């Protein structure tokens, strides 16, 4: 593996054992815990000036803070997504400024591309022939595209309710797909069954938190936000959350940026979930250290219908360590918030609307101040969820 000189190894979040990245493709071999990358901040030697002079955009711009060198990265030009001001929404919330980090501008229209780039790089370097994952839809399209870049096969296990565009483009990129009757947990069961088959021993899992590299890639979102704000740390970042990759990635980013001396503070990291599939919110409200399975998920926001998040405990840590909150939003409020952002010319998705609706709740409850700078993450292109947005307008008679 062509790793950066700053990468020390992979550390288990549970037992704290350290492992060699070249010998550890998935979870901790000692206890099965989630792995994260550990870095030598001195070896990275990253400064604001060195980043300003970087010869790459996107993920490769931050390669000294990542596991793989810029030249070895499987990339389709992910990252470098716009940070768009939303002054009308800021005025409604009564805060200093609102920005939307528009992840729909990534190559396959989803923030998943950040983590997929690193995870497929690792799979290639581990000698995999095929990558596989369960997904609500968008990450399957992403995996198919990046696997094609690396000349690997891919297979996505998706529920029947997955969006047409995600399923279609998974096939267009050359990926295999198993459409599983039922909902997301049924797709997970089918994936796990396939992974346990001896005939699939050469498959490499890209399931959330199975590989350390999807949450590693996710941290670059906050790297970019900080640089785009000229290193002024925002007061709040709101992450629509399924498994927790985004908020966990931002938590890793805050720690690493402070260790590197690039910033002194961290933003409050907030989790936003649909109120009828909100296991992180429920666990936070109860003061629990981990999530419990949400028994009856029921939301129009299919990308976030994840009743048993793989990163639930880590998402709770991210919220609590940074002084954030976990907030549920109704489907109607989420769709209305997405439409309002679209009225400002920001092509927000229904998934992004969950974060915007949660920000309204945070402001109403006094958790956002009049001078605060708030970043809303729009994880998916609005065009990928146009059907549910249009249906919302039709119900209103528009």
Label each region the model flagged.
Residues 2-398:
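PLP-dependent amino-acid enzyme catalytic core
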